[in-house]
Curated annotation (Swiss-Prot):
Coiled coil: none annotated. It comes from Guira guira. SMART domains: KAZAL. GO terms for cellular component: extracellular region. Residues 4-54 form the Kazal-like domain. Glycans are attached at residue 43. The keyword Glycoprotein applies. CDD domains: KAZAL_FS (cd00104). The record marks 16-17 as: Reactive bond 3. The lineage of its organism: Eukaryota, Metazoa, Chordata, Craniata, Vertebrata. This is Ovomucoid.
Length: 54
């Protein structure tokens, strides 16, 4: 199973680095920071579907 460690999040500012991740909501997140902030906002209901665009 594919996982991302989001224990250091949420963070107030994300870099513009582009390394897309596909969330379980079928939305593409630009990088780990954006994805992990969304995970934090979802109270853990959002998970990683796979690396790369959805």
């Amino acid at each position: 199973i594919t996982t991302v460690d989001c224990s250091d999040y949420p963070k107030p500012v994300c870099s513009l680095e582009y390394m897309p991740l596909c969330g379980s909501d079928n939305k593409t997140y630009g990088n780990k920071c954006n994805f992990c902030n969304a995970v934090a906002d979802s109270n853990g209901t959002l998970t990683l579907s796979h690396f790369g665009k959805c």
